[in-house]
Each structure stands twice: as C-alpha cells, then as structure tokens.
C-alpha cells in the first residue's frame, strides 16, 4: 500500500533527525565536561588566541633566550641566574 511507504519514510527521517540531535547534544556535553577538566588534565579545549599572540611576540623579539641574554659587556652570553631549573 502507498500509505505504508510514506509512513516508513517519515519514520526514517524522524529517526535519523532525532539520532543526529542526540549525538550532537552528547558531543556538546562531552566537550563541556572536558573543558571543565573532569576527564583528565589536558590543554584547553578551545585554543587561546592570546597565547598565539604572546608566542609571536617571543619569536619576533630581539635575540633573547629563555635562560639568558646577549647583552653582556664582552658581547657574549650571560645567564640570568645559576639556579637549577
């Protein structure tokens, strides 16, 4: 019968739509759960644009390193401190 085919097609469309809605809600909840830190200690879920800007300033800056700088009186390398890291 023609009526049975349209009912099964409508049921299939509703089933797929509700399944996609359920999967998207579950994925959003999992992402929020991860962002709050309940899963494990990891990086931020959303990449921070301020970190990118700070890294760019570090790369473009003058010839400095993390452990020292180049402006000693004799022109060589001078440490900031002698402490162990």
Curated annotation (Swiss-Prot):
It is a single-pass membrane protein. It is found in: Membrane. The chain crosses the membrane at residues 7-27. Keywords: Membrane, Transmembrane, Transmembrane helix. GO terms for cellular component: membrane. It comes from the Eukaryota. The keyword Membrane applies. This is Small integral membrane protein 35. It comes from Mus musculus (Mouse). The gene is Smim35.
